[in-house]
Amino acid sequence: MSLISIRIRSKTGVENIKLESQLKLKELQNIIEEKTKISTDTQKILYGFPPKALDLSNQDAVISGFLANGDTITIENVSSISSNPGVDSVTNDKVTSSTNSFDRNIKSQPFISQEEEEDGGYATRRVTDDDNSCLFSAVAYVLEDKNRLKGYSLRALIAQNVKSDPFEYNEAVLGKSNEGYCNWIQNPKNWGGAIELSILSNHYKVEIAAFDISTQLMYCYGEDRKYTERVYLIYDGIHYDALSICLTKNGPEDFDITRFSVDDKDSLAKMKVLIEKEFKAGKFTDTAKFSLICLNCNKTLKGEKEAAIHASTTGHGNFTEYKKR
C-alpha cells in the first residue's frame, strides 16, 4: 500500500508524518487528535491553497481523495475560533504553488482602495501589474522600498534559496525535483504562491501576511520564526496586490508605510477593515466556479481544479478567463 507524506500544522507546531494513502478520514482525525491534542469533534481541517475547510461528514472518505504527497493541512480548534471571520489568522505552507500557469488576461481594477480612517493613516491597496508576476511585484513593493520592478529578480532569488538547500526543498515538498522547480520558478509565465511566500519570508526575515478577500482570512508566513516585522499583501483569487498605511488620504506612494511591528494591532485592524470593504464590494474571483478556456486547444473548463487537471494530462498551460455572452 502506498504512503504519502503530509505536514500537520496547528497551535502546537508543525509535524511531518507519513500515512497510508487509503487511510479513512476518521482514522486521520484520530491521528490529528493524538498529534495536536485537539478533539476529533472540535477539529476544523483546512487544506489546499488558499486553505478551505474539509467536509468532515463522510467519515469513511479515503484521504487520497483530497490529500496528495507533500500537502499541508492546518488544524484549528472550532471551540476557540472567533466568530469574526476577519480575526482568524492561519498559516499554510502548501508548497506546491500553482504548477500550471494561467495567462493573466483578467484585469485588476486600476485604482487604489482605501479604508476610511484618519487617525494614524489609511490602509491602502496598491495595485501591481496584472501579469504572472504580481505576487513578486507586491512583495517587492512592501519589502524593496516600493520598487515593483525588483519583483522580477525575486524569482532568481527563490531559485538560489531552493538550490542551496536540497534537503529541505526536496521533491516531496516541491512537487517536482529541486532542479526542475528552480527552472520552473524562473519562467515568468508561472505564478507564485504559498511556497514562494514562505521562502521570501525566510530570506527577508519578516512575516508576510496575505489576506484572502473571499474568506477574509489572513495567512501569515514566518509567524513561527519569531520575526519582529510584518508586511501585508491582498489576494483576490487570481491576483496579488500590496497593502500599506498611507499617511494622507489618497496620498502618493511616497507617503506609504509598508513595514510594521508584529505587535502593531492598530495597523492590523485597519487592514482588516479594508479587507471587509473589498469583500462586501465583491472584489474577488471564485476560482472554483469561474470559467476558463485553454488557448492551446480551445477547451472550456470550470474552475482552477479542472484547469490544473487539463494541464497535467495535456501539457497545455495557457489559460484565460472565459465569459459566456
From Swiss-Prot:
Task: List the catalysed reactions.
Answer: Thiol-dependent hydrolysis of ester, thioester, amide, peptide and isopeptide bonds formed by the C-terminal Gly of ubiquitin (a 76-residue protein attached to proteins as an intracellular targeting signal)
InterPro entries per the UniProt record, alphabetical:
OTU1_Ubl (IPR048857), OTU_dom (IPR003323), Papain-like_cys_pep_sf (IPR038765), Ubiquitin-like_domsf (IPR029071)
Question: Where would I find the OTU domain in this sequence?
Answer: 123-246
Zinc finger (C2H2-type) residue ranges? Answer: 292-316
Top enzyme class:
hydrolase
Q: Does the keyword Zinc apply?
A: yes
The residues the record assigns to binding substrate are: I238
Q: Which SUPFAM superfamilies match?
A: Cysteine proteinases, Ubiquitin-like
Q: Which GO terms describe its cellular component?
A: cytoplasm
Entry keywords, A to Z: Cytoplasm, Hydrolase, Metal-binding, Protease, Thiol protease, Ubl conjugation pathway, Zinc, Zinc-finger
Subcellular location as annotated = Cytoplasm
| GO BP terms | endoplasmic reticulum unfolded protein response; ERAD pathway; protein deubiquitination; sorocarp development
Pfam families assigned = OTU, OTU1_UBXL, zf-C2H2_OTU1_C
Instruction: Spell out the molecular function terms from Gene Ontology.
Output: cysteine-type deubiquitinase activity; zinc ion binding
Q: Identify the stretch(es) annotated as His-loop.
A: 235-239
Give the EC number(s) under which this enzyme is classified: 3.4.19.12
Q: Where is this region: S2 site?
A: 265-270
- The record's region (Variable-loop) falls at 185-195
> Which protein, by its recorded name, is this?
Ubiquitin thioesterase OTU1
